[in-house]
Amino acid sequence: MSSGRIVQIIGAVIDVEFPRDSVPSIYDALKVQGAETTLEVQQQLGDGVVRTIAMGSTEGLKRGLDVNNTGAAISVPVGKATLGRIMDVLGNPIDEAGPIGEEERWGIHRPAPSFAEQAGGNDLLETGIKVIDLVCPFAKGGKVGLFGGAGVGKTVNMMELIRNIAIEHSGYSVFAGVGERTREGNDFYHEMKDSNVLDKVALVYGQMNEPPGNRLRVALTGLTMAEKFRDEGNDVLLFVDNIYRYTLAGTEVSALLGRMPSAVGYQPTLAEEMGVLQERITSTKQGSITSIQAVYVPADDLTDPSPATTFAHLDATVVLSRDIASLGIYPAVDPLDSTSRQLDPNVIGNEHYETARGVQYVLQRYKELKDIIAILGMDELSETDKQLVSRARKIQRFLSQPFFVAEVFTGSPGKYVSLKDTIAGFKGILNGDYDHLPEQAFYMVGGIDEAIEKAKKL
């Protein structure tokens, strides 16, 4: 085990000098003597100097301190011992419930499964959320992104998906909180505890207030734990909130590492960093990882390099829209912008496919007619267009749904709608079976039967 000393500190980036014959390898973990800090080697600058990122605060460090090379990458606890626990980026417990007591530790830098090992599947994953099951159905073992600007409901949607899938699903889940609010992490922990599923979830947090090194690596820590469960033959759920903060942490340290910034100030290695993470989130012949990732969209611009790079890796994209949220329709999913690889008649069947496309056609046509309505009013439309607009407004309202996790705010009990009921309801609206009901009846209800009941009271 070689040792060196600190020669330079700039924020989270620390240069360490080692004897030339024992320079640490890239990604080796170094320990600072007399401090709790772990450093990860990023570059070899020559002359025995390595440039590292601190996995923790650099307060109290100074030049000349001794640093020991552990000779291996950062490793974290894996396996059943992690279930029901909250850990940080290094796998240390932060829930004040004693040591993890793991039997095995894995390094967080691992190769992605080879092409021959990967397995694809077409099984649908029912979420109980109408708009998602209808327009952008999820695949078991697929990757899903929830895209949205600030305050349109990414985290609430994610929490509802966790409640509906993780609680109905009997396997293990891993939640990686990457650069998000501590309050949300706390809420999530209690939500899991109250639902009695905490013993099936491993939680890994690197909050907003953590240094960039933690936020850059915490996603890999969570992923490593999920990979262990997958390789044991389980179907695992991996939730990541938020992928954008992972990119942002890379941006924060990129300039300090001496790289030239690229478009919009992002790191030049943006696509590679995203690929390293996303290529490991995959299903193999042993087991599957189904991942649901929240993606913050800066300034509501989906063409920003960060969300644009994420799009390429996903099987389904759920786009949350500020315009829909402003109408009071929650979940604010845009049914015209959201897509899924599963939306194929050979996978989901003709009835589902035609209903989904029918809903999209009606909403698209309504969008086109809005300008005419704004200028000339409804009276100038043809009878068929008037009927279409009326159905579109019903569909728009029927796409809303009360959530279990938002009961405290809305005061109305949450609803889980099966895929069969979802298809039947929208098919009925498209066929004109409910043309006689007022559009208010379709707002914030579960299945179509509730809308019929609600109409009787209006």
Swiss-Prot record:
Q: Which family does it belong to?
A: Belongs to the ATPase alpha/beta chains family.
Which species is this UniProt entry from? Answer: Pseudomonas fluorescens (strain ATCC BAA-477 / NRRL B-23932 / Pf-5)
Localization annotation: Cell inner membrane
Q: Which reaction does it catalyse?
A: ATP + H2O + 4 H(+)(in) = ADP + phosphate + 5 H(+)(out)
Keyword ATP-binding annotated? yes
Instruction: Return the PROSITE patterns for the record.
Output: ATPASE_ALPHA_BETA (PS00152)
Q: What is this protein called?
A: ATP synthase subunit beta
Q: Which residues bind ATP?
A: 148-155
Kindly list the GO molecular function terms attached to this UniProt entry. Answer: ATP binding; ATP hydrolysis activity; proton-transporting ATP synthase activity, rotational mechanism
Q: Which Gene3D superfamilies match?
A: 2.40.10.170, Bovine Mitochondrial F1-atpase, Atp Synthase Beta Chain, Chain D, domain 3, P-loop containing nucleotide triphosphate hydrolases
Question: Which class of enzymes does this protein belong to?
Answer: translocase
Q: EC number(s) of the enzyme? A: 7.1.2.2
Assembly and interactions?
Answer: F-type ATPases have 2 components, CF(1) - the catalytic core - and CF(0) - the membrane proton channel. CF(1) has five subunits: alpha(3), beta(3), gamma(1), delta(1), epsilon(1). CF(0) has three main subunits: a(1), b(2) and c(9-12). The alpha and beta chains form an alternating ring which encloses part of the gamma chain. CF(1) is attached to CF(0) by a central stalk formed by the gamma and epsilon chains, while a peripheral stalk is formed by the delta and b chains.
List the InterPro entries: AAA+_ATPase (IPR003593), ATP-synt_VA_C (IPR055190), ATP_synth_F1_bsu (IPR005722), ATPase_a/bsu_AS (IPR020003), ATPase_alpha/beta_chains (IPR050053), ATPase_F1/V1/A1_a/bsu_N (IPR004100), ATPase_F1/V1/A1_a/bsu_N_sf (IPR036121), ATPase_F1/V1/A1_a/bsu_nucl-bd (IPR000194)
